[in-house]
């Protein structure tokens, strides 16, 4: 992590500063507690940067704890991917990876303590009846007929639950709080439910599993967390967080603070919707470069530094808002403009023949970065037959068109000035070859007679060209807020992936996955980690040179 990434400020850091100044805490201990039931997305990156960033800046600790209380939906695959994402973003957790399941014995003991205090009971209402009895925002709930069981009966029934004596959905343990509470979360919430499923950490030791709200606060306390940071949807849950800790015998009582979650235009963050995109094969997987997952962004070519910078720029507030996709794209564009070496690739190729060029070819010198001589230069082969992009030639054009036109001149990047003389077309009228002449005395210099040549286009020597597949990725949805659509799948952008067969300069045969290039005049690209082969490299467009959606939105 670069020291240059300046320390941000926000309301949470102000709270921490006050806590340290008052002596309430002498150190800072945070945690990042994902559930291992899916891949992390850009919204999680905000929480990662906040929790790990605070620990880093205050020289404290941040735990990575997996909230693994639902074995039905969780998998070790997600555990490993989450660990990889956190490390890739540039952060390191304190000590060993932790799991909520590490505390199942203590959690069970605390549940028994609540039963002994008359603060928890075994309920045999069905899940549907529990929802019905809970009431609404405008109507109070009503007590379960099982609410007033004795402590002894509840202890026996809870042990029966643990021993597998009830079927799933036939019994649960509930907190005994207040069914008339204005906060629905406090209307006797479920603390334990039955699930006959093998757990990826504990195997078949348990058939009862604690709920998130019971587990989360106790895990925080057992780990000595000082500041428990959650998104705003858990604001009401803070009352239950405090109630549990106030009513069990535990020496540490962390405080929960809420911040706004990250909402991003032109995508969805809901795990259910992301899963639907994958299972219905609208995308090729969780790491599809159009997905907002960290693995998808990484495969597309986003850098960890650009994501950290994005999270820093959007800040941490209590107000929900939706961030423009252009803000995220701006961060990676700035990063790669500064750091990505340049290369030439022709995405929509058409053959160009220089009729007066003599010899088999030559090498021309090109800088790897126009503003960074320390990045060096490379030798690129040039010959009398080259590929140029079809969009860089017109038979006729107005003065605003600064590329190649019949009868006019243009410069080939770091090479010669050429003039278009004639074209050859196929039976359908498509141009197949452009025939040109060149000025042999203009290699990387102006014409001797002083004539001005304004346009510059890129090229690839046909004899040396590397055949490449180029995947032009764009925004996955065609509207800014796809989640608001009646059917979010109906607003998938049909142009979110366009595949082209093109040619690249031969140096790109040594490209490695994860290393970005600016394809001159085209955008920023990286080698695809999944589909590339030695015979046929595949390059993903990370982002264009400029925001082409700005005009679309106007």
From Swiss-Prot:
It comes from the Bacteria. One of its GO terms (cellular component) is cytosol. Keywords: Aminoacyl-tRNA synthetase, ATP-binding, Cytoplasm, Ligase, Nucleotide-binding, Protein biosynthesis. Pfam families: tRNA-synt_1c, tRNA-synt_1c_C, tRNA-synt_1c_C2. Gene3D superfamilies: Glutamyl-trna Synthetase, Domain 2, Glutamyl-tRNA Synthetase, Domain 3, HUPs, Ribosomal Protein L25, Chain P. It is an enzyme of class 6 (ligase). SUPFAM superfamilies: Nucleotidylyl transferase, Ribosomal protein L25-like. GO terms for biological process: glutaminyl-tRNA aminoacylation; glutamyl-tRNA aminoacylation. Its main location: cytoplasm. A motif ('KMSKS' region) lies at residues 268-272. Belongs to the class-I aminoacyl-tRNA synthetase family. NCBIfam families: glnS, PRK14703.1. This is Glutamine--tRNA ligase. It comes from Shigella boydii serotype 18 (strain CDC 3083-94 / BS512).
């Amino acid at each position: 992590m670069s020291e240059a990434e300046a320390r941000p400020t926000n309301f949470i850091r102000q709270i921490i500063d006050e806590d340290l100044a008052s002596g309430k805490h002498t150190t800072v201990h945070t945690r990042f507690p994902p559930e291992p039931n899916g891949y992390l997305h850009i919204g999680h990156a905000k929480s990662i940067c906040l929790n790990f960033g605070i620990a880093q800046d205050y020289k404290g600790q941040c735990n990575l704890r997996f909230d693994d209380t639902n074995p039905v939906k969780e998998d070790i695959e997600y555990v490993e991917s989450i660990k990889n994402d956190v490390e890739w973003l540039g952060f390191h957790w304190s000590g060993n990876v932790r799991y909520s399941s590490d505390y199942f014995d203590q959690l069970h003991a605390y549940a028994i303590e609540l039963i002994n205090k008359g603060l928890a009971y075994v309920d045999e209402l069905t899940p549907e009846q529990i929802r019905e009895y809970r009431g609404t925002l405008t109507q109070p709930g009503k007590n379960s007929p099982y609410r007033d069981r004795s402590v002894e009966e509840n202890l026996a029934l809870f042990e029966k639950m643990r021993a597998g004596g009830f079927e799933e959905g036939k019994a649960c343990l509930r907190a005994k709080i207040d069914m008339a509470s204005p906060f629905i979360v406090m209307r006797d919430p479920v603390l334990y439910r039955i699930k006959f499923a093998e757990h990826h950490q504990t195997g078949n030791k348990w058939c009862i599993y604690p709920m998130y709200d019971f587990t989360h606060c106790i895990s925080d306390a057992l780990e000595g967390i000082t500041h428990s940071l959650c998104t705003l949807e858990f604001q009401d849950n803070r009352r239950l967080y405090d109630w549990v800790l106030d009513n069990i015998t535990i020496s540490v009582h962390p405080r929960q603070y809420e911040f706004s979650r990250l909402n991003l235009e032109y995508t969805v963050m809901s795990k259910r919707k992301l899963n639907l995109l994958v299972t219905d094969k609208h995308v090729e997987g969780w790491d599809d470069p159009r997905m907002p997952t960290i693995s998808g962004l990484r495969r597309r070519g986003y850098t960890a530094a650009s994501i950290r910078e994005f999270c820093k720029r959007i800040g941490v507030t209590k107000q929900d808002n939706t961030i423009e996709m252009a803000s995220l794209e701006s961060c990676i564009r700035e990063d790669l403009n500064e750091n990505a070496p340049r290369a030439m690739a022709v995405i929509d190729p058409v053959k160009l023949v220089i009729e007066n060029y003599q010899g088999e070819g030559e090498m021309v010198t090109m800088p790897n970065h126009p503003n960074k001589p320390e990045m060096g230069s490379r030798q690129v082969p040039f010959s009398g037959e080259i590929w140029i992009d079809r969009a860089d030639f017109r038979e006729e054009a107005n003065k605003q068109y600064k590329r190649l036109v019949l009868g006019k001149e243009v410069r080939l990047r770091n090479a010669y000035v050429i003039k278009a003389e004639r074209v050859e077309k196929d039976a359908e009228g498509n141009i197949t070859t452009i025939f040109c002449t060149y000025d042999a005395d203009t290699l990387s210099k102006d014409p001797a007679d002083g004539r001005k040549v304004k346009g510059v286009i890129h090229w690839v020597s046909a004899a040396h060209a590397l055949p490449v597949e180029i995947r032009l990725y764009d925004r996955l949805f065609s509207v800014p807020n796809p989640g608001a659509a009646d059917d979010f799948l109906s607003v998938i952008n049909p142009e979110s992936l366009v595949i082209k067969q093109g040619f690249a300069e031969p140096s790109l045969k040594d490209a490695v996955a994860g290393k970005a290039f600016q394809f001159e005049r085209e955008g920023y690209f990286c080698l695809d980690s999944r589909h590339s082969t030695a015979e046929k490299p595949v390059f993903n467009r990370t982002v264009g040179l400029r925001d082409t959606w700005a005009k679309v939105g106007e």
